[in-house]
């Protein structure tokens, strides 16, 4: 009976360590961010909060 409990505990411990290592690997490799080059707005336009070029009105 005692050997069965030890085996079950070892299996659970192995699974937990595998899940933790998988999670750590996912967190470390998730930081690959692709940066898109930004373009400039034409004269008389400015970028709004969404990044779209909007015409500037002088009043």
Swiss-Prot record:
Expressed by the venom gland. It is found in: Secreted. Keywords: Amidation, Secreted, Signal. Residues 28-31 form a propeptide. Its main location: secreted. The keyword Cell wall biogenesis/degradation does not apply. Residues 1-27 form the signal peptide. The modification Histidine amide is found at residue 58. GO terms for cellular component: extracellular region. This is U17-myrmicitoxin-Tb1f.
């Amino acid at each position: 009976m005692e050997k069965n409990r030890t085996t079950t505990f070892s299996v659970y411990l192995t699974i937990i360590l595998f899940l933790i290592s998988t999670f750590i690997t996912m967190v470390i490799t998730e930081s690959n961010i692709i940066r898109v080059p930004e373009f400039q707005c034409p004269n008389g336009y400015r970028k709004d909060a969404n990044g779209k070029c909007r015409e500037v009105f002088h009043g």
